[in-house]
């Protein structure tokens, strides 16, 4: 797995939010974006996930230019995101929230059960609360749920 960002520029109308960043992430690496408020960290992640349009430059994943690939197809390629601010479905149960993470992997019940077991091993508190509405969890538990949901898609990049 290799994620490569080449001279990425992203605009919000006439405002250039990302001004020519380049990054390479190889399999097994952990990379952190650090910067002041408004520096473009969230915009960068949204652009990698396909939620923001690339103005110029390129995003390559395993050698394939995915700059114009829609967000839902990027999930199929193995790119997932645990959204900022937890971003869970508050009216859905913990289990239903987790199931949403594997939505693109239809008809794979055995894999889903295996993945649920893995998530519950990582976050035992989620198993205890599997039938509880996500919105009733504490802030930390909601973050666990958001990460667990992202992991349910079996991402190559999170």
Regions found by a protein language model. Give the residues of each.
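Glycine-rich phosphate-binding loops of nucleotide-dependent enzymes
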Residues: 1-158
């Amino acid at each position: 797995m290799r994620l490569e960002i080449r001279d990425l520029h992203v605009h919000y109308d006439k405002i250039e939010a990302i001004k020519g960043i380049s990054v390479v992430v190889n399999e097994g690496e952990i990379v952190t974006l650090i910067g002041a408020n408004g520096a473009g960290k969230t915009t960068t992640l949204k652009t990698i996930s396909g939620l923001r349009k690339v103005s110029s430059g390129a995003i390559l994943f395993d050698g394939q230019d995915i700059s114009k690939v829609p967000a839902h197809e990027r999930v199929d390629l193995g790119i997932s995101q645990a959204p900022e601010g937890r971003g869970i479905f508050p009216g859905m149960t913990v289990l239903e929230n987790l199931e949403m993470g594997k939505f693109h992997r239809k008809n794979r019940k055995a894999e889903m059960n295996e993945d649920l077991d893995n998530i519950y091993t990582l976050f035992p508190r989620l198993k205890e609360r599997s039938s509880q509405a996500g919105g009733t969890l504490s802030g930390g538990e909601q973050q666990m749920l958001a990460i667990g949901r992202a992991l349910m898609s079996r991402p190559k990049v999170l």
